[in-house]
C-alpha cells in the first residue's frame, strides 16, 4: 500500500480544508487499499476534526506537540505573517525528520507550502511531491524566487480550475508540471441527499 500524506496547516477554516478531507476520504473509500491517506497535524489545526468529525477514521499524525492552531483564528495581515514565520521555525527540523523516517510515497502540499518546498529542494527526498494550488497565488518577490528554484524538484502542480491552469501555464518553469484537478468537494452520498431535497418554487 502506498502512503499519501497531506500537508495543510490552516490558520482559519477555508475551502481548502474541506478539499483535503474529501480527497483523503475518496482515497480511503475508492482506492481498494492501494493508497493510505494520512493527514499531517502540523500544530494542532486538525485536533477538532480528529476528535469530532473523522467518521472514516482517517489516519492523522502529529508533526509537533504545538497546539497553537487548535481552534484559533490567525487571520489578518500581521497575525498571519507572524504565525507563518512561527510555523516555519518550529516545523523545519521535525519535517526533515519526518520525511527521512516515514519516506512517504506521495506528499501533497496545500497551504504554507514554502517550507516543504524548500526542505525537499535542500535534501532531494525520493518522495513524489505534489503542490496543490487553491487559487491564483500572489507572486511577491519571495515566492517568485522560491518557486523558480524549488518547483523543478517536485513532480506535479495541480490547479482547481481551467482559469488558474491557463494563468499558471504562462510561467515557463510551470508548463511541464501543471495539470487541472478539480476539488472533490461533494461526495456521492451528498449528491444523493441533495437529489431528495425539494426545490421550492418562488
Task: Annotate each predicted stretch with a short phrase.
Residues 1-2, 192-202:
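Nucleotide-sugar donor-binding and catalytic loop/hinge architecture
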Residues 6-14, 26-85, 164, 169-171:
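N-terminal strand-loop element at the rim of the active site
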Residues 17-25:
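A conserved mid-protein helix/loop that constitutes part of the nucleotide-sugar donor-binding site
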Residues 83, 99, 129-155, 173:
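A conserved, positively charged/aromatic
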Residues 87-91, 109-115, 133:
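Short His-centered aromatic/hydrophobic patch
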Residues 103-105:
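Proline-aspartate-enriched helix->loop->beta-strand connector
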Residues 107, 153-162:
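A short beta-strand/loop micro-motif in the catalytic core of glycosyltransferases
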Residues 163, 184:
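Carbohydrate-associated surface elements
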Amino acid at each position: 500500500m502506498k502512503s499519501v500524506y497531506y500537508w495543510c496547516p490552516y490558520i482559519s477554516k477555508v475551502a481548502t480544508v474541506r478539499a483535503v478531507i474529501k480527497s483523503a476520504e475518496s482515497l480511503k473509500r475508492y482506492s481498494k487499499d492501494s493508497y493510505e491517506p494520512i493527514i499531517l497535524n502540523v500544530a494542532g489545526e486538525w485536533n477538532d476534526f480528529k476528535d469530532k468529525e473523522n467518521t472514516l477514521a482517517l489516519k492523522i499524525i502529529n508533526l509537533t506537540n504545538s497546539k497553537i492552531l487548535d481552534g484559533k483564528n490567525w487571520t489578518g495581515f500581521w497575525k498571519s505573517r507572524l504565525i507563518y514565520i512561527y510555523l516555519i521555525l518550529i516545523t523545519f527540523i521535525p519535517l526533515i525528520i519526518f520525511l527521512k523516517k516515514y519516506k512517504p510515497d506521495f506528499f501533497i502540499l496545500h497551504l504554507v507550502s514554502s517550507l516543504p518546498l524548500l526542505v525537499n529542494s535542500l535534501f532531494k527526498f525520493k518522495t513524489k511531491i505534489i503542490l496543490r494550488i487553491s487559487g491564483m497565488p500572489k507572486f511577491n518577490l519571495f515566492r517568485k524566487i522560491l518557486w523558480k528554484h524549488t518547483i523543478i524538484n517536485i513532480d506535479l502542480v495541480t490547479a482547481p480550475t481551467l482559469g488558474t491552469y491557463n494563468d499558471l501555464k504562462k510561467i515557463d518553469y510551470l508548463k511541464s508540471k501543471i495539470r487541472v484537478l478539480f476539488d472533490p468537494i461533494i461526495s456521492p452520498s451528498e449528491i444523493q441527499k441533495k437529489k431528495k431535497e425539494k426545490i421550492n418554487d418562488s
